[in-house]
């Protein structure tokens, strides 16, 4: 009986893992600089829990942000508060990534937003984008880091 219990115990350790490593490598890094965090997921803020992670940009504005996977732009927000300029990308793997506090979007999206703001005669926007409008490939520049919205310094707010 003891031998059977020992065998079961040994076998159970072979089939359990505390964490399963992601074998798919679904995403690349959104920045081509060393990734240093200035804010972590779930940390307590003055009136909410932080919903993503913040990457430091060495106090620089305008560092290119790259799409970590292929997909399409599904939402764009522009506001003087909150996320400021933010872009949402829905990826082929079913995940959506969010990039916030941007200085600006890429040229094509910037022009689209500029035209929308003038057509609607308003600065603040929250637009759902049709799937075919802005196709994004892995590594495409989607915007540039900034300090827009309710931000205390240049950085990239990133969510998956």
Residue ranges and their predicted role:
Residues 92-93, 114-117, 156:
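Short, charged/polar low-complexity linear motifs in solvent-exposed/disordered segments
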Residues 100-102, 107-138:
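Aromatic/His-enriched, Gly/Pro-containing loop or helix-boundary segments
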Residues 18-96, 103-105, 132, 137-138, ...:
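Surface-exposed, glycine-biased beta-strand/turn segments
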Residues 153-160:
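Histidine-centered catalytic micro-motifs
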Residues 1-25:
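Bacterial Sec-dependent N-terminal signal peptides
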